[in-house]
Swiss-Prot record:
Pfam families: mit_SMPDase. Its EC number is 3.1.4.12. It is found in: Endoplasmic reticulum membrane; Golgi apparatus membrane; Nucleus envelope; Cell membrane, Sarcolemma. GO terms for molecular function: metal ion binding; sphingomyelin phosphodiesterase activity; sphingomyelin phosphodiesterase D activity. One of its GO terms (cellular component) is nuclear envelope. This is Sphingomyelin phosphodiesterase 4.
Length: 791
């Protein structure tokens, strides 16, 4: 051992702090490795909380630590950090070294998710066994954790802690060191093959404490009933040593899983979920896209972990269960017992509160990953990627029934989102296509319908079983001991699932019922309308590309800058985007028809109705509005029409055209000078201009062509709503010289003067010719324009 080992722990910590910021990461890690190897646990105990904070950052987000969430593989520090934090690396070696002793570390309750924090403050111990025997009386506001628990709590908290990262740090979340570490820890502590590697140090004190045994005379409280056992009654000073040696095998696995689930998913209790249905309630927590992606990684691995259950352990025979290892037993119950309820409430919140944009794809894929466990079985015969013709094996019918709400209720939630989303956008169209493709898998819709039929079974058969007692965690049991009696039928399981999540008085809306079918038909109409809009945008972009050619720069094209599509439609769509939108929406229509058994006649009728409305020019009308003193006000229907690109306002400048902001293609000095000249002329000759424009002969036509009259403004205002004050404002005929300040006009004049100079024309003769040619050109243009109007 190094000579400095005789120093007091405070000196070791002080020395580390003094040199920490002055050394590069690789040197710090090298020295830490040496310290972990050379020093005993008694001296390492003092530096452990400080080291965890230096790596993961502070819980309040002020200190960012190693920025694992932004540390990308291309960074030089990436491999150093990954090697140090590996499950078999120096940091975990330190954890195990401290775990072999009876050291405890404090974790503030204030940094726990809201429902857990509220429960503890109310004197009710959370259902999760992770928190048993972690709190002391009198209440200190702290959890007392062993080293492994403390490490994992800080690791999980760093994902949701608000951190002020330096600007300019960008990268893919799925390539970050944090994301890769989560995947590494899941594969190490929840292995699909073999067992969890043993700790390198003797450990008899690190096991998860078993909850107090539950009395068998506790009555069953019904579907979804919650235990209100008091905190004082549950806190007993039990030994942390588990009497069963086989359970030593998975204590780290169960701890890691419970920490991840509680810290990442348990942000909304069932009661809070019910309250959040009201828009007046402020949401307590909003996950980030990165947070959701990590949750999806957790869901995918748990499905893979659960599907690796040995065939002999899948048997429902009690004798088979009695011979299962603790890890195999964990695989059996991991999804239903640990994840289902909290993930359902988490996804419900995201479906209801996430912005209506393409970032919802992360939430969507998390949901689709959970409801397709058959994708993660590793079956060689079942490895097609989301193949729509792949039949869902019959063995998954029980999973569908026991997770019915995650199929039906969340599908209805997605349907409501889709009807309010801009489906002209290819990214949003892709999400509709993905959901329709998943639910169109053969036999899946039949399984869902079967589950709904089981839920509708009468209650009398269930009431006969009211004496059954389930040792669930909320009634004092542990996660691994909470198995339902083998005689429980499918009806009971489905009803228990629905009532436990939605409450005894829930009004279940059938996914294949008449109300939902109406919503599906409405979505199909919106999809058809979005296809029409995409086609119109494509045609418009083609037309604008032709008008904005090189020749149009010289004046041949239209100078109207208010006629283009507004917003980001043209930027995001493009030819390829329109093509993808059509492809996604066409396939989504086919899949929806398969799911809800719509025949070709019904589909063609819906699409033809949309096409006929579009051909009648409805798409060129204003959105649905009601008049008011301040102009037109959008209705709910009008908002939906704008969101889906069905109708739009023509956004045009409604003020004085001469006072518009100076454009980049105009000379500022000339704009101001010509405005002064035209204002002087209009003030002196305004009445004569009005008389000229009011004539119905040829001179009146020429006057209206050259002078800006009220008729042109009235024509523009038909396309865009205006206030009553703007509508009542009188418009007078006047001369506008602003077009002469355009650089395009100036360049055209320069080229004409150069041409006439080559033909030996002088300055005054060239000016006269230009005026005559311009007058004749405008005269002919006005003549043909009037002819077209009369026809």
């Amino acid at each position: 051992m190094a000579a400095s080992a005789l120093q007091q722990p405070s000196y070791l910590l002080a020395n580390l702090k003094a040199d920490w910021t002055n050394k590069p990461l690789h040197q710090r890690c090298h020295e830490l490795c040496k310290i972990i190897d050379d020093y005993p646990a008694k001296e390492l105990h003092a530096i452990f909380p400080w080291l965890v904070e230096c790596v993961f950052g502070s819980l309040d987000g002020i200190l960012t630590g190693w920025n694992l969430r932004f540390l990308q593989a291309r960074s030089a520090e990436y491999s150093i950090a990954m090697e140090f934090l590996d499950p078999s690396g120096p940091m975990m070696k330190l954890v195990y070294k401290l775990q072999a002793e009876e050291y405890k570390y404090e974790f503030p309750i204030s940094y726990l998710p809201g429902p857990i924090k509220s429960s503890i403050h109310a004197g009710v111990l959370p259902d999760c066994p992770l928190f048993h025997n972690k709190i002391q009386f009198p209440m200190s506001g702290l959890l007392f954790l062993n080293p492994f628990e403390y490490y994992m709590f800080n690791f999980a908290s760093s994902l949701i802690a608000p951190k002020n990262y330096p600007q300019g740090q960008h990268g893919s979340s799925s390539d970050s060191a944090y994301f890769v570490l989560v995947d590494t820890y899941l594969k190490y502590f929840l292995p699909t093959e073999g067992n969890v590697p043993p700790s390198p140090f003797s450990d008899t004190r690190g096991t998860v404490a078993s909850p107090a045994p539950r009395s068998t005379n506790v009555p069953y409280v019904g579907y979804g009933g919650h235990s209100t056992s008091l905190l004082k009654r549950h806190i007993t000073h039990q030994s942390s040593v588990n009497a069963d040696p086989a359970a030593q095998e998975i204590w780290r696995s169960e701890t890691l899983l419970q920490v991840f689930v509680e810290m990442w998913l348990h942000h909304y209790s069932l009661e809070m979920y019910q309250k959040l249905q009201s828009p007046q309630v402020k949401e307590p927590f909003m996950p980030s896209e990165e947070h959701v992606l990590v949750v999806r990684l957790l869901v995918k691995h748990l499905h893979t972990f659960s599907s690796s259950l040995k065939p002999e352990s899948i048997s429902s025979s009690p004798s088979a269960h009695s011979h299962s290892s603790p890890l195999e037993e964990l695989k059996r119950v991991v999804v239903q017992r640990f994840v289902q309820q909290k993930l359902y409430v988490f996804l419900q919140h995201c479906f209801g509160h996430w912005p209506l944009d393409a970032s919802f794809r992360a939430v969507l894929e998390t949901w689709l990953s959970y409801i397709q466990p058959w994708r993660y079985t590793g079956d060689k015969n079942n490895t097609q990627t989301d193949g729509p013709n792949r039949t869902v094996p019959d063995k998954w019918a029980s999973f569908v029934q026991e997770n019915l709400l995650l199929y039906t209720k969340l599908f209805q939630g997605f349907l409501n989102r889709a009807m309010r989303t801009d489906l002209v956008n290819a990214k949003n169209a892709l999400m509709v296509f993905r959901v329709a493709k998943v639910f169109a898998q053969p036999s899946l819709s039949e399984m869902i319908q079967k589950g709904e039929q089981l839920f509708l079974e009468p209650e009398h058969a269930i009431l006969q079983r009211h004496n059954r007692v389930f040792l669930t965690p909320s009634h004092g049991g542990s996660f691994l001991s909470a198995r339902q009696p083998m005689g429980t039928d499918n009806v009971f399981k489905v009803k228990s699932h629905v009532y436990s999540l939605e409450g005894q008085d829930c009004q279940y809306n059938l996914m294949f019922g008449p109300d939902q079918r109406k919503n599906v038909l409405k979505l199909i109409q919106i999809i058809a309308q979005a296809r029409q809009t995409a086609k119109r945008i494509s045609d418009h972009s083609t037309e604008m590309a032709a008008n904005n050619s090189f020749l149009s720069w010289f004046g041949v094209g239209s100078p109207d800058h208010n006629s283009t599509f507004t917003g980001g439609e043209m930027d995001e769509m493009g030819g390829e985007g329109v093509k993808k939108t059509h492809e996604f929406l066409d396939k989504a229509l086919d899949y929806l028809c398969q799911i809800f058994r719509l025949n070709a006649g019904q589909l063609s009728q819906l699409i033809s109705n949309v096409a006929s409305v579009d051909n009648n020019g409805a798409s060129k009308q204003l959105p649905d509005c009601i008049p008011s003193e301040n102009g037109l006000v959008l209705t709910d229907l009008g908002r939906l029409q704008i969101i889906n690109g069905l109708r739009r306002f023509e956004i045009e400048y409604q003020g004085d055209p001469e006072l518009q902001p100076i454009r980049s293609y105009e000379n500022a000095f000339l704009v101001r000078l010509l405005f002064q000249i035209s204002s002087f002329i209009n003030e002196r000759l305004g009445e004569h201009m009005e008389v000229l424009c009011s004539r119905q002969d040829f001179l009146g036509s020429v006057g209206r062509h050259y002078l800006s009259s009220s008729s042109a403004v009235v024509e523009q205002r038909r396309k865009s709503p205006v206030t009553r004050q703007m509508r009542d404002r009188p418009q007078r005929a006047r001369l506008s010289l602003r077009a002469l300040a355009s650089y395009r006009t100036l360049l055209t004049l320069l080229l004409l003067y150069m041409l006439f100079a080559l033909l030996s024309f002088g300055l005054f003769s060239s000016t006269g010719l230009i005026l005559i040619i311009s007058f004749l050109y405008e005269l002919l243009s006005n003549f043909f324009h009037e002819k077209l109007k009369t026809h």
